[in-house]
């Protein structure tokens, strides 16, 4: 722990953390895209699989899945990253069209919230237009096609987006 009370990993610690993150994200991708387990359920199952696979199985699974760049929630695999112009949804301005890039892992722990996000199509790859911001209610309204929905800022600040053209 350093002077700022932050934990710094050794090179070996970083390697191990990246390995676990890769196993977890790969398991989520496999469960969702190959086995058809719903997007909002794969996180809890991946926690079990990430510790139960050997390096050989991980290598073969990655090859079988054609080396995905992200998990189903948009989290980049180690070695990949979000676009540099990525920001969080709560920073999107009225009238702005954005594409969802990633739902941060903190939100993945709530299946109920993920179900709501899926129902509203607030998932990686989907485009939304920001309609209005209601600071008094700490929320914003967004629209996709004909569907409008209100989203609290404390959720929107955990969704990474990029601005796109209409």
Where do the language-model regions lie?
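Short, charged, intrinsically disordered terminal tails
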Residues: 156-166
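Mid-protein regulatory/catalytic core that forms ligand/cofactor-binding pockets
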Residues: 51-158
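Electropositive, surface-exposed helix/loop patches at the edges of structured domains
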Residues: 44, 48, 146, 166
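Basic, amphipathic "hinge/linker" alpha-helix immediately C-terminal to the N-terminal HTH DNA-binding motif
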Residues: 5-24
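Amphipathic alpha-helical dimerization/coiled-coil segments
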Residues: 25-69
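Generic beta-strand structural signal
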Residues: 1-2, 133
């Amino acid at each position: 722990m350093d002077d700022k009370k932050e934990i710094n990993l050794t090179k070996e610690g970083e390697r191990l953390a990246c390995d676990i993150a890769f196993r977890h994200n790969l398991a989520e991708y496999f469960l969702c895209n190959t086995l058809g387990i719903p997007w909002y359920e794969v996180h809890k199952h991946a926690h079990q699989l990430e510790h139960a696979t050997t390096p050989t199985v991980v290598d073969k699974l990655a090859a079988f899945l054609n080396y995905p760049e992200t998990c189903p929630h948009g989290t980049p695999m180690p070695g990949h990253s979000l676009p540099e112009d990525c920001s969080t949804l709560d920073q999107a301005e009225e009238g702005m069209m954005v594409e969802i890039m990633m739902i941060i892992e903190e939100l993945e722990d709530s299946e109920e919230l993920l179900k709501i996000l899926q129902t509203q199509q607030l998932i990686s790859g989907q485009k939304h237009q920001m309609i209005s911001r209601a600071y008094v209610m700490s929320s914003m309204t967004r629209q996709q096609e004909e569907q409008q929905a209100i989203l609290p800022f404390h959720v929107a600040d955990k969704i990474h987006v990029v601005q796109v053209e209409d």
